[in-house]
Amino acid sequence: NTVSSFQVDCFLWHVLKRFADQELGDAPFLDRLRRDQKSLRGRGSTLGLDIETATRAGKQIVERILEEESDEALKMNIASVPASRYLTDMTLEEMSRDWFMLMPKQKVAGSLCIRMDQAIMDKNIILKANFSVIFDRLETLILLRAFTEEGAIVGEISPLPSLPGHTDEDVKNAIGILIGGLEWNDNTVRVSETLQRFAWRSSNEDGRPPLPPKQKWKMARTIEPEV
């Protein structure tokens, strides 16, 4: 159930953190660890559960499962699970860099938060993202950011820690909203080759999804002021 899942996730995060503390994790591993920590805090707040207590309970659940699991069954389970790949458009510095907005706008679409600076006008912008893929489709978005040619961050799509879980269609919709909002101010927006390959599959030659003018206008108008 929801509580048990949260407890197990807390314990597994604790194990991964111990691994990272020994300086054994690579950049994608550490990035995912930070994202998962935010997600667990949000879920704990929503469920009204203490993370430390949940971690202990999760340890008991995992230990019980391992006691019942044979080595052969473990090998079969691992072999049957499809492996996902982690793809990076952005460097760790680009992902962790703070950025500021002169005219902040924000919209929540499902479990994704879309932010942009509507003071940006007449710029060439590219969307970059770090995400995992499975079966050649986007599985989980870690972070998407919009960059100007000068390297300034002017927009962002990120998962909400309190609402984990999203589909590739959710990501497509969020990207469409972000593009619509940026194009409203006469910016030219492109999508990175990696995003084109795994998230869009049908795009214009300029590297972005086709959006009818009315749809772009509607998307731009639906972006509400940031609280």
From Swiss-Prot:
GO biological process, alphabetically ordered:
symbiont-mediated suppression of host cytoplasmic pattern recognition receptor signaling pathway via inhibition of RIG-I activity; symbiont-mediated suppression of host gene expression; symbiont-mediated suppression of host mRNA processing; symbiont-mediated suppression of host PKR/eIFalpha signaling; symbiont-mediated suppression of host type I interferon-mediated signaling pathway
Question: Sorted alphabetically, which keywords does the UniProt record give?
Answer: Eukaryotic host gene expression shutoff by virus, Host cytoplasm, Host gene expression shutoff by virus, Host mRNA suppression by virus, Host nucleus, Host-virus interaction, Inhibition of host innate immune response by virus, Inhibition of host interferon signaling pathway by virus, Inhibition of host PKR by virus, Inhibition of host pre-mRNA processing by virus, Inhibition of host RIG-I by virus, Inhibition of host RLR pathway by virus, Interferon antiviral system evasion, RNA-binding, Ubl conjugation, Viral immunoevasion
Q: How is it modified after translation?
A: Upon interferon induction, ISGylated via host HERC5; this results in the impairment of NS1 interaction with RNA targets due to its inability to form homodimers and to interact with host EIF2AK2/PKR.
Q: Which GO terms describe its molecular function?
A: protein serine/threonine kinase inhibitor activity; RNA binding
Where located? Host nucleus; Host cytoplasm
Q: Do you know which Pfam families this protein is assigned to?
A: Flu_NS1 (PF00600)
Q: Give the start-end ranges of region CPSF4-binding.
A: 177-212
Which parts of the sequence are annotated with region: PABPN1-binding?
220-227
Recorded hits in InterPro entries, A to Z, give: NS1, NS1A, NS1A_effect_dom-like_sf, uS15_NS1_RNA-bd_sf
Family designation: Belongs to the influenza A viruses NS1 family.
**What does the subunit comment say?**
Homodimer. Interacts with host TRIM25 (via coiled coil); this interaction specifically inhibits TRIM25 multimerization and TRIM25-mediated RIGI CARD ubiquitination. Interacts with human EIF2AK2/PKR, CPSF4, IVNS1ABP and PABPN1.
Domain-related comment: The dsRNA-binding region is required for suppression of RNA silencing.
Q: What is this protein called?
A: Non-structural protein 1
Q: Which organism is it from?
A: Influenza A virus (strain A/Mynah/Haneda-Thai/1976 H3N1)
